[in-house]
Regions:
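Predominant activation on well-ordered alpha-helical scaffold segments within soluble catalytic domains
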Residues: 26, 30, 148, 178-182
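Extended, subdomain-level signal for the structured scaffold at the beginning of enzyme domains
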Residues: 1-116, 126-128, 158, 186, ...
């Protein structure tokens, strides 16, 4: 029986990225891999940290270095993860954001092959790239109006921890990225593995709707 291919998870980071938006989900995936290896199974997730620039200052001032460039092609199956940025509105009028949006517009999402995961106002970035048109999505409550304004064809859902619409998975923000990744681990691996990861991270397996 052929081995299940690993899922490549691409965290696309801009300057000012909210650290908890990506660090929490990344840790969930790391712990999932660790648990699988402890059971004698292969790791399931390969994490990539990509950016228009090789160095980026995060929301808390920590500097990320050695970021990989935005790839011309993605190993599949793959998830592209977009996260929120510091500030009340998402600034896309800068070279880094324009480069990321250009790259995002070239993605061809397909369930089980190339999927989008947004945390917090990462959904607004996705909307600027046209990836949420005709889709239902959520975002941080402070960005719900902005999301609706950026793409009037996106069905914006309030009061949701996370939701899924085809190949698009979105979450409300900050710690809810962990909730969403636990759900994705449960879907792609097993509910038991998701429960082990939640226990290791000392978080609830599922909060709210």
């Amino acid at each position: 029986m052929p081995e299940t291919p690993p899922i490549h998870v691409y965290f696309a980071l801009l300057p000012g990225s909210l650290v908890l938006d990506w660090a929490g989900p990344a840790e969930a995936l790391r712990i999932a891999n660790q648990a699988l290896l402890a059971q004698g199974q292969p790791a399931r997730f390969v994490q990539h940290f990509i950016s228009p620039t090789p160095q980026s200052v995060t929301s808390v001032g920590a500097i990320l270095t050695g970021l990989a460039p935005l790839p011309a092609t993605l190993a599949q199956p793959a998830w592209v993860v977009l996260v929120g940025l510091a500030g009340q509105r998402i600034d896309v009028d800068n070279p880094e954001a324009r480069a990321l949006l250009h790259w995002l517009r070239g993605l061809r999402l397909a369930a089980g092959q190339l999927e989008l995961v947004t945390v917090c106002a990462g959904a607004v970035l996705a909307a600027h790239a046209g990836l949420l048109s005709g889709r239902r999505a959520t975002t941080h409550h402070l960005h719900l109006g902005e999301l609706a304004q950026v793409d009037p064809h996106c069905d914006v859902a309030a009061n949701r921890v996370f939701l899924a619409d085809g190949p698009v998975y979105s979450s409300a923000g900050v710690t809810t990225g962990i909730d969403l990744l636990l759900h994705r681990i449960s879907e792609t691996c097993s509910p038991a593995l998701a429960a082990r990861v939640a226990q290791a991270m000392v978080v609830a397996l599922r909060r709210g709707p």
